[in-house]
Amino acid sequence: MAASTAAQVQLSEEALGLARIFENPKGSLEAASKLLQKNHDEFHVFWRDVGGHNHIPHSVLSILALGGGPAELQRAWDDGVAIQRPTPPLDEDVVKKLENPAEFRARIGSIPNYTNFLHFFRNQMDKKGWQAVVSEYAFSRTPLAETIFAQLFEGAYHPFIHIGFGIEFNLPSIIAEGLAQAATHDSAGIEGFFLEAERQAAQSKGPGKSLVQLLDEVRTTEKIKTAARLPDGPVRVRDGVIGRAGAEIAALASQFRVPADQLSRGAAESINISAYTAGAAQRAGKARKIDFFHMHNTTSSLFLTVFLNQPWISTEDKVRIVEWKGRLDLVWYAACSAPDLNVDHVIGYKPAQSAGWGWKELYEAINVAHDDGHLAKIVRALKNGEEVSRPFESGEGAEAFPIKGDSWLKLAQMSYDTTLDLPDDDKWIWGAGFLPLWNKVPSL
């Protein structure tokens, strides 16, 4: 049997990522391809069943886009490799069975089936091409595709991010990993939320609302704001927001609607608001600290640009991607207990270690900073946000775009300054609306 072409990692000069500033040193593509191939062949997409997403591909590809060379790419690998675990065993009989939609559905959410799904999607790509496979299993509107499309947004957007990297860098192997991650991810119950919000949006005759307005409504709707509780831990969305205020959050989120002729603006608004929640959710008297989950709203926002750039995705599906992303950002804001938002925390930020830097200096520093990939991802997403948001930051409707001008760089500097040289768990605050979590953040 011929080797799977979708199993091979081969980066090319034609697809080196968004938000680039300078070129990579010689040998960078070969080094990155080698590391990504080793990860693909040896490691599970989950290093832990709950919340244990393998970030090695994210980190390596982010550093590549930031202009890193072989040494910096190796640093990205080294910072993520210790926690990884091997792939589960392969069962060729199961791989064959996955061609049956009923057999496929029966194994959704089964992490031990990751390798089987990975091989299944690679086989499908070898036969049909990766665009056709993504279209069939995420965008075809079949019952199975509806579930997988929702699953892309599970786990704080990780399958969406993973597939997005694969599409951005034209790597079918990474796309197959992301689809297999989506298929095996545990569920937070967001499929029902998405479909109900979409149903209500379709029935609505009135105008929609901006995400800024809807964030305010989340914060002032007591049932939604208090739905997630600290003891919920990793199930703040499933048992908290969806479990205790599912009807209310669906009705609220349904009001974010994107007309097809305003697709670019809608995506830019979502990208801007993800950055707004990341930077503006601070606590008076405390040092700046970015919320871990709002950070994921931001890192995933870059892939709105990636998906919108794909000519093979229909306008209708692009609208759906933007709407679902914006609606889920509202859920995650509620899951963090809807902290007060004040953009002055970003506008007035005084950089520390990064004082006087521009984007180039920041990129260079991030390439060598010890991190699991989150820092590189958020900073690159912010640079992309600066570019796509700029046309909408003034003029009519500009109030829907609170992050403007040099605030993008300031927020990127804040991301660097507040995480540098800290253990991974201390780099971020894990729920900015929960007062007890600020106790470990230094006072000013």
Swiss-Prot record:
Signal peptide: none
PANTHER family assigned: BAEYER-VILLIGER OXIDASE MDPL, PROTEIN, PUTATIVE (AFU_ORTHOLOGUE AFUA_5G03330)-RELATED
The enzyme's E.C. designation: 1.-.-.-
Pathway named in the protein's UniProt entry: Secondary metabolite biosynthesis
Transmembrane portions of the chain: none
Function: Baeyer-Villiger oxidase; part of the gene cluster that mediates the biosynthesis of pestheic acid, a diphenyl ether which is a biosynthetic precursor of the unique chloropupukeananes. The biosynthesis initiates from condensation of acetate and malonate units catalyzed by the non-reducing PKS ptaA. As the ptaA protein is TE/CLC domain-deficient, hydrolysis and Claisen cyclization of the polyketide could be catalyzed by ptaB containing a beta-lactamase domain.
GO MF assignments: oxidoreductase activity
UniProt KW keywords: Oxidoreductase
Family designation: Belongs to the questin oxidase family.
Organism: Pestalotiopsis fici (strain W106-1 / CGMCC3.15140)
Record's keyword annotation contains Oxidoreductase: yes
Alphabetized Pfam families for the sequence: Questin_oxidase (PF14027)
Induction and repression of expression: The cluster is expressed in rice fermentation medium. Three regulators are located in the cluster (ptaR1, ptaR2 and ptaR3), suggesting that the production of pestheic acid is controlled by a complex regulatory mechanism.
Name of the gene this protein is made from: ptaJ
Name this protein carries in UniProt: Baeyer-Villiger oxidase ptaJ
Cofactor section: NADPH
